[in-house]
UniProtKB/Swiss-Prot annotation:
It comes from Thermotoga neapolitana (strain ATCC 49049 / DSM 4359 / NBRC 107923 / NS-E). One of its GO terms (molecular function) is rRNA binding. Keywords: Ribonucleoprotein, Ribosomal protein, RNA-binding, rRNA-binding. Belongs to the universal ribosomal protein uS8 family. This is Small ribosomal subunit protein uS8. Part of the 30S ribosomal subunit. Contacts proteins S5 and S12. The gene is rpsH. Gene3D superfamilies: 3.30.1370.30, 3.30.1490.10.
Amino acid sequence: MWSDPIADMLTRIRNANMVFKEYTDIPASNLKRKICEILKREGFIADYKYIEDGKQGILRVYLKYKGGRKNRERVIHGIVRVSHAGRRVYVDKDHIPKVKNGLGIAILTTSKGVLTDKEARQLGVGGEVIAYVW
């Protein structure tokens, strides 16, 4: 049986977002923390914090919504895992994808760390496409 911690993280965020939860808890790792940092910097989540639990720790991700209580609208419209254990997706610097014609982001792991598609294009590096968020 395969387990994919990044897909699990994205699914937890997607599910919590669909029912307008205030936050969701995710088992922590360094890669997940970097992905949360990108989501926060790009404005897809309100915040996240690391909670020590004596084991690996927990990332509490605070979701972001537009509007008031009655007419609430999601900031994250879609979040999809691209590269997974059965099918790795790598791109070079000339073929970095644009998500929703630039309205979304692609998250990549590169030799320079975890970057968005825009940052990877600016630095001229390719890598493994982890996820699309729009």
